Amino acid sequence: MSGRLIGKVALVSGGARGMGASHVRAMVAEGAKVVFGDILDEEGKAVAAELADAARYVHLDVTQPAQWTAAVDTAVTAFGGLHVLVNNAGILNIGTIEDYALTEWQRILDVNLTGVFLGIRAVVKPMKEAGRGSIINISSIEGLAGTVACHGYTATKFAVRGLTKSTALELGPSGIRVNSIHPGLVKTPMTDWVPEDIFQTALGRAAEPVEVSNLVVYLASDESSYSTGAEFVVDGGTVAGLAHNDFGAVEVSSQPEWVT
């Protein structure tokens, strides 16, 4: 690796497995020091042991403000500051709108939206003290377009996209950038029950976690120094449009002349 994140300290939520663990490993590989949190303590401790002195694991329920404060304090105490936040933690639940329980609605809002808000709020002070920062909110393509039966997930991911923009405007003068990443289907434990062909993608496959992590590293680095308030889509072409695969088999000479 090329050391693109040397001198930076990052905090990652939901970092014990899946995309979060991939983000942690990718940033450490590029020279960052990383504090990461989750509620999956055994898995988190195993990742921290693998990364040795470059990482610290903390228990972090993203709905609890005090645990965010403790995670930030760990980063500042252990590594001397905080420059990057990756709001990665999230959950998915599904159901028809008429049967969608209020408790499930509230739960997904608490984790996917309030958790992001609390994370951003917690890191502003140390990032202002550092004179710079990059906040990376993991949204989804469901933050760009709706999906049947994913009402809570879609609502929260759209909201994260909006929160990204309002905070980017507010924090920009302090040198803090805020962007959102919008993955499509990614091969993680949270989505292992989803058929890989559920979305018709231009590339014809689901993403590997590292393909999202590569974008996280870019946004954490100074390479993205003029990017803020923006959406970065990594979805294999899912939201680009309908993939009319049948058209590709039609001979050009046999196509009708369409007049509009």
Curated annotation (Swiss-Prot):
Residues reported to bind NAD(+): R17, M19, D38, D61, V62, N88, Y153, K157, V186, T188, T191
Q: What is this protein called?
A: 3-alpha-(or 20-beta)-hydroxysteroid dehydrogenase
Q: Which UniProt keywords apply?
A: Lipid metabolism, NAD, Oxidoreductase, Steroid metabolism
* Stored PANTHER family: 3-OXOACYL-(ACYL-CARRIER-PROTEIN) REDUCTASE (AFU_ORTHOLOGUE AFUA_6G11210) (PTHR43180), NAD(P)-BINDING ROSSMANN-FOLD SUPERFAMILY PROTEIN (PTHR43180:SF28)
PROSITE patterns cross-referenced by the UniProt entry? ADH_SHORT
pH-dependent activity:
Optimum pH is 6.0 for reductase activity.
Cite the source lineage: Bacteria, Bacillati, Actinomycetota, Actinomycetes, Mycobacteriales
The protein's Enzyme Commission number: 1.1.1.53
Task: From the UniProt record, give the pathway where this protein acts.
Answer: Lipid metabolism; steroid degradation
Give a GO biological-process term. steroid catabolic process
Transmembrane segment boundaries: none
> What does the UniProt entry list as the effect of changing T69K?
Maximal improvement in solubility
Question: GO molecular function terms here?
Answer: androstan-3-alpha,17-beta-diol dehydrogenase (NAD+) activity; androsterone dehydrogenase [NAD(P)+] activity; oxidoreductase activity, acting on the CH-OH group of donors, NAD or NADP as acceptor
Q: What is the effect of changing V47M?
A: Maximal improvement in solubility
The reply to whether Lipid metabolism figures as a keyword in the UniProt entry is yes
**Which reaction is the catalytic activity of this chain?**
androstan-3alpha,17beta-diol + NAD(+) = 17beta-hydroxyandrostanone + NADH + H(+); androsterone + NAD(+) = 5alpha-androstan-3,17-dione + NADH + H(+); (20R)-20-hydroxypregn-4-en-3-one + NAD(+) = progesterone + NADH + H(+)
Q: Which GO terms describe its cellular component?
A: plasma membrane
Task: Say what the protein does.
Answer: Probably involved in steroid metabolism. Catalyzes the oxidation of androsterone (3alpha-hydroxy-5alpha-androstan-17-one) and 20beta-hydroxyprogesterone (4-pregnen-20beta-ol-3-one), and the reduction of progesterone (4-pregnen-3,20-dione). Shows a preference for NADH. Has no detectable activity for oxidation of L-3-hydroxybutyric acid and only an insignificant activity for reduction of acetoacetyl-CoA.
